[in-house]
Swiss-Prot record:
This is 2,3-bisphosphoglycerate-dependent phosphoglycerate mutase. Coiled coil: none annotated. Its EC number is 5.4.2.11. Keywords: Gluconeogenesis, Glycolysis, Isomerase. Gene3D superfamilies: Phosphoglycerate mutase-like. Pfam families: His_Phos_1. The active site is at residues 11, 89. The record marks 184 as: Transition state stabilizer. Signal peptide: none annotated.
Length: 249
């Protein structure tokens, strides 16, 4: 049986991750720690002998810069890259920019957990005139404004990620191409839920650490047969726990 592989990487720590703020579609850059994390991810992939034919990422620079740093380490700077807003982080609506712990202190940790991890729970929406609304961002000027969210749940994030997976990424993997996706915690969670057929309750407990390569192995029909993180297991466990704790007061 021929095993096909996919690498998923959440971007390295961003400036707003460092400040424990809801980031969503805000286009913040990597922190210095995040740049180091991205290079470490590249080193892990290089050590394990990975190289790629195609790369996919979002249009947000914390993801695109993570990918660039990884490809620098792999000496694959000329790899074909496709950027899509459909791989963007989930849009956190009016929560975008707020500190997660302060928001938990105000609204309660359980409410914030529902906003962060509930499958269908929508955070409060932005007003269309809010400067944070994607329709007011030149980055999305060529897109239909009706496609651009004012808030998103994980369910609506799945709705935009899955067609991109089915129509763009999946055919390349079936064709035998080696693919890496560098995206965001929730766009990766959306993909993991779909690929692994997880329930709404199961995905609520899944947390994706920054810049740790997640390897998926598939059979020839692209059914998942295994997945695992690259790196030190204890360190990865600590990083996952840190992500889970972000929404606590």
């Amino acid at each position: 049986m021929t095993i096909k592989k996919l690498i998923l990487v959440r971007h390295g720590e961003s400036e707003w991750n460092k400040e424990n703020r809801f980031t969503g579609w805000a286009d913040v850059d990597l922190s210095e720690k995040g740049r180091v994390e991205a290079q470490q991810a590249g080193n892990l992939l290089k050590k394990k002998g990975f190289s790629f034919d195609f790369a996919y990422t979002s249009v947000l620079r914390r993801a695109t810069n993570t990918l660039s740093l990884i490809l620098d380490v792999l000496q694959q700077q000329n790899l074909p890259i496709e950027k899509s807003w459909r791989l963007n982080e989930r849009h956190y609506g009016a929560l975008q920019g707020l500190n997660k712990s302060e928001t938990a202190a105000k609204f309660g940790s359980e409410q914030v957990k529902q906003w962060r991890r509930g499958f269908s729970t929508l955070p409060p929406a932005l007003n269309l005139n809010d400067p944070r609304a994607p329709a007011n961002d030149s980055l999305y000027a060529t897109l239909n404004k009706n496609d651009l969210p004012l808030t998103e749940s994980l369910a609506t994030t799945v709705d935009r990620v899955v067609p991109y997976w089915d129509e763009v990424v999946k055919p390349r993997i079936i064709d035998g191409k080696r693919v890496i996706i560098v995206a965001h915690g929730n766009s990766i969670r959306a993909l993991v839920k779909y690929v692994d057929h997880l329930s709404e309750e199961e995905i609520m407990e899944i947390n994706i650490p920054t810049a740790v390569p997640l390897v998926y192995e598939f059979n020839s029909s692209l059914q998942p047969i295994n997945h695992y993180y690259l790196g030190n297991a204890e360190e990865i466990t600590q990083k996952v726990a840190a992500v889970a704790a972000q929404g606590k007061a």
